[in-house]
C-alpha cells in the first residue's frame, strides 16, 4: 500500500526504477493495487494511478494492473505500514481482501470491493497504457493462510464485475497451482488471455506451455524464476538425479 498512499507515493523513485527497467529492455510492468487505498482516498488514488501510467508510458512500458491477491499477510491497515523484517521475503506484502473477507463479514466488504473494482475499471477502461487487467493473483493462496477452493466465489464475482464494465483491455487471472482444480477450470475458461505462473525449470515450463496451448488463446507468463528453486536448465537436471 505504501506505493499508492498519498504520504508515501514517490514518483521520483518510480521514474528512476522504471528507467532502469527500460534500459534492460522491459516493456511491461505488473503492478498491484489495493482496495483500502481506494476506500480511504478514491480520487487521490485514481490520480496517482494516472501519474504512474504517465511515468511508465514515458519509458515505453505498458502496465498490467492486479486487483485481488491471496498472497502473504492476511491482515493489514491503512496509514503507516510495518517496517520490513530483515531476511523475511515480502514481509510487508498485504493480501486483498485477505481475512477481511475470508474471516470477516462478507456482506460488508463485498459491496466495497465491487464498487472499487468497477470504479477503477470504468475510469481506465479505454486507457491504452494498460495492456491487461489481472483480476486475482494466485487465488487460493499458500502457506499457513491458504484459502484453497474457498476463493472460487470471490473469483467468480470479480469476473462478473469485470464483464459488467466490459473494458477494452482483456481480463485474466493467472493459473499457478494445478492442484486447485475448480479454480483453474474457471480461470482458464474465463480469461481472455491465458496467464500463468511457474517457478519450475525449463523443461517443466515447456510442458506447461504445451498444456495451456490447447485453449487457443494468447498466453503470458506473469511470474517466473526463483533463484532458490533453481529455475534454469539445471533445475530439471537436478530433479532427475
Which sequence ranges carry the predicted segments?
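Short acidic/histidine-rich active-site segments
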Residues: 221-226
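Conserved small/polar residues in nucleotide/adenosyl-binding loops
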Residues: 230-237
